[in-house]
Amino acid sequence: MNTLLERIESALIGPEPSVSEREMLQLSQLTLTRRSLTEGMLAIASIGRGKTTLLRTPLRAMLRDGWGGLIPTVKDSMIADMSECICAESRDADLILFDDKAHSVFNPFASITDINEAAALLTGVSEALNKGNHTGSDASFWKQQLQLVLRHLFALCQVQAGKLDLLLAATLFDSRAKTPAELQDPNWRTGNPMWAAIQSARASNDSDAGKAAHYFMETFPHQSGGLQSSLVATVEGVLDQLSREPLRSLFSGESTFSMRDLFDNGKICVVGLPVLSSDSGRIANAILQFCFCREAVKAKRDHHSFLILDEGQELVTTDLMEKMAVIREFKVAVFFLTQNLSVVDQRIGQLAREGLFGLMATRIFGPQNHAATRQWAAEQCGKGQQTAKSTSRSRSNRGSQSSSSETLSSRWDYICPPNQFAQLDIGETIVLRNDEIARVHWHPTHPGRGGSGRII
């Protein structure tokens, strides 16, 4: 009987809407659903012109809806701002503040068993630490060589300890033979951890281990001085940081949470070591962001989650750009906030930035003092037929009488002229989604209630 009533009800009012179509935000005349948010959101405004203000509204909407996620931090103030939003929505029980004071631990190798993935993780960390210093034609070659070193290093870790271990990797690399002559030195071989690992690898039936032993015996010691010096400086720089506090305690031992907690259990991780505070902060944010993106695309999930990238130019990585194309299919919303085009181009280059921004379906333009960014924003909004009014006045020869006339003309021009983005006040934005444009005001003290950007 109940089934019959349900069929009648469905025929009368239509099928139940998809959970992904639940309405979340009303931005003037634009309505954003869960699905809309997972299609990516870009917010771009000059320094101190309201990016964090507008972020509070969509963040609180997602928190209210039970989403979990990751919030990397660039500045100290972001930790307090994001934590305040989480507590305001009564989600403080779900907050994971990842820093040494909170005794948080996240061991990335608790869930990574593949040497290629481990090598990709440390390559991403080195990219963040070096801020993309290797660019141009040699960038891909250098990255390939770096991954080769790390992959062989982790292969030796596996054969020696039966697992991937950062501290062991640091010990092995530090004890490597620097020259072919040192490799043949009996004194170097005696009690040397790297030589012991090479011997274990040569005795095993593991092909990866055998290749790793050959690499550190025949290839690496004979590499050209410039390439070897660059690789050594990079690998040692990353491993040295991870071997010292606070990163040693944060990323080794038994984890207090997992990435699955963020995706499946609604937990929210705020990184308590800002990128700009130290190299430790830059590495901590890079590791968590890498692991979040990798876990995101491993399985389809019932729950929605988010990744907040405020001051995204400091957080963007190659791995993020690769995952952005597919991450929406896994119900993950990415929010990328930045100042202008120039700061992103400086980090990843113009072509990569164009590709990244092209994946953001919703674009929010705030007050902007960078001319090239204003021009770009106007071009994104497009052109259309614009009506212009002109007035002319005339007087008689004696000057006693005057007349005026108005003329309306149509011309093809920007829908939102570049100078319009310079005239916006703090909290005022122009929002572009597909071919729809809305002017939205975000309330600074009552996010989601005041202004025209509201939580549904």
Regions found by a protein language model. Name each.
Residues 2-28, 32-332, 411, 416-450, ...:
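P-loop NTPase motor domains
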